[in-house]
Amino acid sequence: MASQQHSVPCISRSPPEQPLQVKVVGLFKSSSFQIAKSAAESLKSNYPSNFEDPIIIPVQEFAWHQYLQEKKRELKNEVWEYSSYVMCFINDKLLGDALDLQKWAHKVWDIVDFKPPALYEALTVDYSAKFLRDTKHNFVFLDISIDLYPIGRLIFELYSDTCPKTCKNFQILCTGKAGFSQSGIKLHYTGSIFHRVVRNGWVQGGDIVAGKGDNGESIYGPTFEDENFSVPHNKRGVLGMVNKGRHSNGSQFYITLQAAPYLDKKYVAFGQLIEGTDVLHHLESVPTENERPIQNCVITASGQLYA
């Protein structure tokens, strides 16, 4: 549903003193993002002297929800019930969603940019595939249940160009392709649990030995070295390796619940949650006793995506 249209700098087709800047921010795999992107590009191509090149910002699902919350805090009542997967701006002033941009382009600039829904869907599929390929990163998933009730999937982008060894360890532990360790430990996250929830800190899992939180094993042996500390803990959803001190990474991992700069230079972060906003919220909300979940939070399946 289109949101109420907001006032924007231009109300006629007469050339403005300065070219207008259209910005589109949205969920990269939503058709509404493609609709807005197409409208913004049509405005530029039809009126090149009236418009700057459009700023097109595709974001992942988790990042979109974070962005939307920030905008709701910034703009307050103006977008409190905003439900679209895209936001369109003219000279940094909110216009509305994709339909609002189409209507504005038609009313003010006589641009008709309406394509069949099937075409937008096809454009979305092609754009999404290219968007993920262009990252040159690997993607993995964890399916989660709480007390046998499936709550959904966490999807992570692994920064394999920055931390290749750490990412390979996590990726193969997700797929289970390494089989068993020399000590007989099954090197697979499936069946393991989230054993710790630190309020406003992180959720922790990956003890594939006994699930107590005091053990784990990597695909390289019991532990491996800290690869680097290039990735900062500067937001919610950062994925990192738990350790017992320098160079003691195994299989345990954490997902931050907010920015945690105190973890920088001490723990190796190597990825980011990109989908699973509600799932992470469920995990951080489970009742605990001494930071251990009272409910059984299990990884029921894990593997690689988009390979």
Swiss-Prot record:
Recorded GO CC terms: cytoplasm
PPIase cyclophilin-type domain sequence ranges: 141-304
Cysteine pairs bridged by disulfides in the record: none
GO molecular function (one): peptidyl-prolyl cis-trans isomerase activity
Pfam families recorded: Pro_isomerase
Source organism, top-level taxon: Eukaryota
InterPro entries per record: Cyclophilin-like_dom_sf, Cyclophilin-type_PPIase_dom
Function summary: Probable inactive PPIase with no peptidyl-prolyl cis-trans isomerase activity.
Protein family: Belongs to the cyclophilin-type PPIase family.
Protein name stated in the entry: Probable inactive peptidyl-prolyl cis-trans isomerase-like 6
Species this protein is from: Bos taurus (Bovine)
Organism lineage string: Eukaryota, Metazoa, Chordata, Craniata, Vertebrata
Gene designation: PPIL6
